[in-house]
């Protein structure tokens, strides 16, 4: 079984190689409008470089980043995507019409097998040069946000009173103590007069009303 899968894999690889070699040889004839050492006319250069759908080789993993358990054959596919120049730094080449195309791709799962399946890819059919609105808006937002943040920080630092962090008066029975935030001095909530009214006396260490010692 493994031998058969390997044979199929190498046969497909050979067919792909022969197909690529055939088109590589035919390409100069198909696109041979210009001869060697010939000067390409301005209008031809302008039309071919302006914003338009251009065949681009796109990595499959770029379109399907979650399919990491597979190896794809081929690893990239030819897609029509917007590209070219807009002749203005404030413009960018963006798609205005799109459609999906389905292609047969070989999926290989190492040590498990392989199969040819259908995968959908996005293609651009129409492109236009449009203002970089989103990018400019984001830049303005980030600049504006930074300024507001700095103002808030300045306001906070201007009106925030200076204070020294105080340690707790006691780990146990904190509710019996009161602390001065300026001096960090701890004092008892109970008073000596309050303890005496109950025929008790104030223990300044624990801030509790204890029985008088005899």
UniProtKB/Swiss-Prot annotation:
It comes from the Eukaryota. PROSITE patterns: PDGF_1, PDGF_2. One of its GO terms (molecular function) is fibronectin binding. GO terms for cellular component: cell surface; cytoplasm; extracellular space; membrane; secretory granule. Residues 131-142 have a biased composition (Basic and acidic residues). The keyword DNA damage does not apply. Residues 131-162 are annotated as: Disordered. Glycans are attached at residue 100. Residues 143-159 have a biased composition (Basic residues). Keywords: Angiogenesis, Developmental protein, Differentiation, Disulfide bond, Glycoprotein, Growth factor, Heparin-binding, Mitogen, Secreted, Signal. One of its GO terms (biological process) is positive regulation of cell population proliferation. SUPFAM superfamilies: Cystine-knot cytokines (SSF57501), Heparin-binding domain from vascular endothelial growth factor (SSF57593). Homodimer; disulfide-linked. Also found as heterodimer with PGF. Interacts with NRP1. Interacts with BSG. Interacts with CD82; this interaction inhibits VEGFA-mediated signaling pathway. Belongs to the PDGF/VEGF growth factor family. This is Vascular endothelial growth factor A. It comes from Canis lupus familiaris.
């Amino acid at each position: 079984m493994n031998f058969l899968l390997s044979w199929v894999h190498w046969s497909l690889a050979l067919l792909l190689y022969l197909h690529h070699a055939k088109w590589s040889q035919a390409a100069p004839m198909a696109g041979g409008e210009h001869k060697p050492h010939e000067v390409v006319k301005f209008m031809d250069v302008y039309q071919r470089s302006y914003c338009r759908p251009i065949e681009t080789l796109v990595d499959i993993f770029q379109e399907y980043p979650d399919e990491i358990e597979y190896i794809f054959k081929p690893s990239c596919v030819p897609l029509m995507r917007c590209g070219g120049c807009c002749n203005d730094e404030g413009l960018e080449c963006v798609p205005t019409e799109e459609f999906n195309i389905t292609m047969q791709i070989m999926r290989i799962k190492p040590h498990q097998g392989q199969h040819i399946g259908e995968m959908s890819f996005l293609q651009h059919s129409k492109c236009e040069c449009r203002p970089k609105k989103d990018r400019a808006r984001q830049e303005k937002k980030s600049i504006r946000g930074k300024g507001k943040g700095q103002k808030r920080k300045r306001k906070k630092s201007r009106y925030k009173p200076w204070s020294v962090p105080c340690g707790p008066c006691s780990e146990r029975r904190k509710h019996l103590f009161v602390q001065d935030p300026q001096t960090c001095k701890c004092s008892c909530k109970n008073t000596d007069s309050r303890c005496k009214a109950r025929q008790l006396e104030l223990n300044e260490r624990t801030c509790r009303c204890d029985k008088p010692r005899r």
